[in-house]
């Protein structure tokens, strides 16, 4: 009987990508098959995220629930990876001594070896280093799971925003070689993938070396990906406004495969707070780039990230953020109350704003963002949208669902499952709070 792997993933798309590569690795090297139940597993993996507050508590709480499984089956291997593992390192075993393997985002390629050594020696294995040899050099070809795929094009971040742990947990920016990325996407396309999302913590800072020694930027990468037979839709995330270049704007205007949707985090509309965050741009500079983009690509949707209650944020600062939201007109966006991350510069800043005030501001901001996002959905009613059909509807097996260019789920009645993995034209009948309803056009 094949041995089983259970994997739980917290956090961002990069973690989802990393988890998929862990499955590929362990499937190839140890013939592990994924199971949906931790109690059936021979190996349990927890891929962690440290962006939000209480991330460590969430990790130890989950590990505590698996303690009884380990006691019942001492041969089971429990491994913890991701950004909390990178931050905590061997300290994870101080609170959860039954954990066998601790590895960081840059050492996941060593996972099969670490599991083998832990099994043989019965000794814990910990490696949260940032090796110079890229993990991508040691990964097998990616497993295909549907018509959409994530492709990591770079790792880490060198911006060192004062609130962010990424440079400390994933290291400095390292771009994958250009030809390696293209080879991976060709493999995906040959196996039925129609949409790729190019991933990086600062993806528009991509600078990949080509076979002839040149450095190619993200715009050039997008143009070459668009020329790959079978790839019909391209996304990328997450971007930094500083490196949102004219060449990228030109790519948005000229590459039809690149979706009319951009996620460009701004965090705040206050120049004072942006400076304290070390974002190195102003609200006006952010808006100027979006005006140029919208002039080149009319109708493009913009989503963003916002942090409310950053240390020292005044009511005036918050109102400047609300004004930015009005000026830009965002699609559905992500927003959070600031959470202190140990080891970051912002963790040492005085924070005198009451939590109740922060929550009140967050509610007001989210309410307005949701209004703006729903208005975009409402304006889509009566239009025909080309969607990539991805699966059966979550609520009705008699329906299929897919995504629009601006990343909205569309549910529509259809009794032809062969449409899954294909593009289809759907007439939008109505807008729901978090999805659209449509009718398939023949």
Curated annotation (Swiss-Prot):
It is found in: Cytoplasm. GO terms for cellular component: cytosol. It catalyses: N(6)-dimethylallyladenosine(37) in tRNA + (sulfur carrier)-SH + AH2 + 2 S-adenosyl-L-methionine = 2-methylsulfanyl-N(6)-dimethylallyladenosine(37) in tRNA + (sulfur carrier)-H + 5'-deoxyadenosine + L-methionine + A + S-adenosyl-L-homocysteine + 2 H(+). It comes from the Bacteria. Its EC number is 2.8.4.3. SMART domains: Elp3. Keywords: 4Fe-4S, Cytoplasm, Iron, Iron-sulfur, Metal-binding, S-adenosyl-L-methionine, Transferase, tRNA processing. Catalyzes the methylthiolation of N6-(dimethylallyl)adenosine (i(6)A), leading to the formation of 2-methylthio-N6-(dimethylallyl)adenosine (ms(2)i(6)A) at position 37 in tRNAs that read codons beginning with uridine. Monomer. Belongs to the methylthiotransferase family. MiaB subfamily. This is tRNA-2-methylthio-N(6)-dimethylallyladenosine synthase. It comes from Pseudomonas fluorescens (strain ATCC BAA-477 / NRRL B-23932 / Pf-5).
């Amino acid at each position: 009987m094949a041995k089983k792997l259970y994997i739980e993933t917290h956090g961002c798309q990069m973690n989802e990508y990393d988890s998929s590569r862990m499955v590929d690795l362990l499937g190839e090297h140890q013939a592990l098959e994924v199971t949906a139940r931790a109690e059936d597993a021979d190996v349990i993996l927890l891929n962690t995220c440290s962006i939000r507050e209480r991330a460590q508590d969430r990790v130890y709480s989950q590990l505590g629930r698996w303690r009884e499984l380990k006691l019942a089956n001492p041969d089971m291997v429990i491994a913890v990876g991701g950004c909390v593992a990178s931050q905590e390192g061997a300290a994870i075993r101080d609170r959860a001594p039954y954990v066998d393997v601790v590895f960081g985002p840059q050492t996941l390629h060593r996972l099969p070896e670490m599991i083998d050594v832990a099994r043989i020696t019965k000794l814990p294995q910990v490696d949260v280093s940032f090796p110079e040899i890229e993990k991508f050099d040691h990964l097998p070809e990616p497993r295909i799971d549907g018509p959409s795929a994530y492709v990591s094009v770079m790792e880490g971040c060198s911006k060192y925003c004062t609130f962010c742990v990424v440079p400390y947990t994933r290291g400095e920016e390292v771009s994958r070689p250009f030809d390696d990325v293209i080879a991976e996407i060709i493999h995906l396309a040959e196996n039925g993938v129609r949409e790729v999302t190019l991933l990086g913590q600062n993806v528009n800072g991509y600078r990949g070396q080509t076979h002839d020694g040149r450095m190619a930027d993200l715009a050039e990468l997008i143009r070459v990906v668009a020329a790959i037979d079978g790839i019909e839709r391209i996304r990328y995330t997450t971007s930094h406004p500083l490196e949102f270049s004219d060449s990228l704007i030109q790519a948005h205007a000229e590459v039809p495969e690149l979706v009319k949707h951009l996620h460009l985090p701004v965090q705040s509309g206050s120049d004072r707070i942006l400076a304290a965050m070390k974002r190195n741009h102003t609200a006006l500079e952010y808006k100027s780039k979006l005006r140029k983009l919208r002039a080149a690509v009319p109708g493009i949707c913009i989503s963003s990230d916002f942090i409310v209650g950053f240390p020292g944020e005044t009511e005036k600062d918050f109102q400047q953020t609300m004004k930015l939201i009005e000026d830009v007109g965002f699609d559905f966006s992500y927003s959070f109350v600031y959470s202190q991350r140990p080891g970051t510069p912002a963790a040492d800043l005085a924070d005198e704003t009451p939590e109740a005030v922060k929550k009140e501001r967050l509610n007001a901001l989210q309410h307005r963002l949701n209004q703006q996002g729903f208005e975009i959905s409402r304006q889509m009613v009566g239009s025909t949208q080309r969607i990539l059909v991805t699966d059966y509807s979550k609520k009705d097996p008699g329906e299929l669902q897919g995504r629009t260019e601006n990343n909205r789920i569309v549910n529509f009645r259809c009794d032809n499952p062969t449409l899954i993995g294909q593009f289809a034209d759907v007439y939008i009948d109505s807008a729901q709070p978090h999805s659209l309803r449509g009718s398939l056009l023949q």
